[in-house]
From Swiss-Prot:
Induction (free text): By stress conditions e.g. heat shock.
Residues found modified as Phosphothreonine: T197
Organism (species): Rickettsia peacockii (strain Rustic)
GO terms, molecular function: ATP binding; ATP-dependent protein folding chaperone; unfolded protein binding
InterPro entries in the cross-refs: ATPase_NBD, Chaperone_DnaK, Heat_shock_70_CS, HSP70_C_sf, HSP70_peptide-bd_sf, Hsp_70_fam
Function: Acts as a chaperone.
DNA-binding in keyword set: no
Protein name: Chaperone protein DnaK
Top-rank lineage group of the source organism: Bacteria
Region (Disordered): 598-627
UniProt family annotation: Belongs to the heat shock protein 70 family.
Keywords: ATP-binding, Chaperone, Nucleotide-binding, Phosphoprotein, Stress response
Basic and acidic residues biased stretches: 612-627
Amino acid sequence: MGKVIGIDLGTTNSCVAVMEGKEPKVIENAEGERTTPSIIAFANGEKLVGQSAKRQAVTNHRNTIYAVKRLIGRNFIDPMVKKDQGIVPYNIVKADNGDAWVEADNNKYSPSQISAFILQKMKETAENYLGDKVTQAVITVPAYFNDAQRQATKDAGKIAGLEVLRIINEPTAAALAYGFEKSASKTIAVYDLGGGTFDVSILEIADGVFEVKSTNGDTFLGGEDFDTRILNHLIDVFKKENGIDLSNDPLALQRLKEAAEKAKKELSSAVTTNINLPYITADSSGPKHLNIKFTRAELEKLVDDLIEKTIEPCRKALQDAGFKASDIQEVVLVGGMTRMPKVQEAVKKFFGREPHKGVNPDEVVALGAAIQGGVLNKEVTDILLLDVTPLSLGIETLGGVFTRLIDRNTTIPTKKSQVFSTADDNQHAVTIRVFQGEREMAKDNKLLGQFNLEGIPLAPRGLPQIEVTFDIDANGIVHVSAKDKASGKEQKVTIQASGGLSDAEIEQMVKDAEQNADEDKKRKELIEAKNAADSLVYSTEKTLTEYGDKLSSDDKGAVEEALAALKAVLESEDTALIKEKTESLTAASMKIGEAMYKAQSESQPAAESAANDEKIVDADFQDVEKK
């Protein structure tokens, strides 16, 4: 079994790590950064990922996709999707299956596809470091992700060419990294406030056993919401001062978003910052500039309710685990937003203790995923991870009631069966509708999917016995079966959301991704060949000018001919031809090298003679009489 990489697929940034010896290690990307922006852009038929996509966002906002994790596994009519539509500059569209997709460069992409592009970048980063192919990964998700979101994340891995060995909850991964190679037994809380989601998990750690007791959270609360508050504040201030509403100017909005994120980060360490955006817009009187002094106190006032929203899930998680705040021995902070002093203050106030800041909040989740990868390929031993399902699972029964089969915070993997019957006389088929959530009526919960069990022998209602079995695997993904005990007829399914990607769609996306990877590789080879050729042309022309007179007319003619041939193909798209002409010029240029060496050899004795002459010093001597 080869190396298993751990990937933190984040809303704002992503990170990849691997076990190196007995320690997990974060891998730097090609730009030398330890995290990569979770941003994809399409420009002139080219796909950009990470920092390169982020750099051009201002001028290409319609085709720059970010925070897609907030859309993954969601239906287009989801209220959270509607909320996002009013914030992001790119188009969110309704897919044929009812899911929320994004539109860029006149193409539609599923959130799983966009996520796959980011995962491909993480995969390439690991392969460049390891010098070997990577095919297996552990990918993290928010603990409060439902089945559809987990399945969509797994699909993203498959599209990226990865076998996803395990989907692991982000707080659990953080706890793994925190408790790795620590022998002390502790009850900890992991408070994870990232770019787009919030999770809190309560765990007991003892002798290498990491047992999650409960989890809670909000999959639509994170740093993006903090940025939006600052952005709206800047729009309001500018409107009051200049009478111009920037909310309808996409270019200005993108600049404001970047400025808001930058100011938020600066105010984690400073108490005041200046937001200066020259030429933000213009009217009949000329260009307008935005220059606003922004304080930490103003920021805290703007986002106070968002921070407060994280406290109720903490309270519920403690209650579900059967603990009081005073029972928690350590609070581990995860996610970039936990650098904000006001967030740390709120955590300290609720748990009654100073939070632990000994882990890097941007990297700890990827490190934990790498450790879990090490467990799965036997590199790491003596660790047992017991995670839980975040939401209750059940089916719709008579009257639209939600009947739970598996309660939230049940340790996974788990399996539970219950016998149901028909609601009508002579009913030959039943539809099993599977829901996930905590409300008492099925319609108020998340419909994960449905399937039919047919061929039930005709009988009065209430007589047939239909056994429904829920099986949740270690990834938190749901498998359901229904069996008529009289006839033995059985129907088994891995729940696929009412939307979701079909197997055929996933396979097509895998092929597209492989094709794009080949095209990207060919494009890179072409650029590298052109760069090498261009460099050779420049150096040859320079040396030809300096030493051309040292060559015979035949040799000089051969070099000039090869030089002209290479220059003629520099603008072509034929990599092989450019390489061929480059090799020809390299061979012809050997004659220049010989001429250069000969010229330097001839000048060296004269130079040495001159140097020796310089060492001879004529001196006048004068006798000095002693007095």
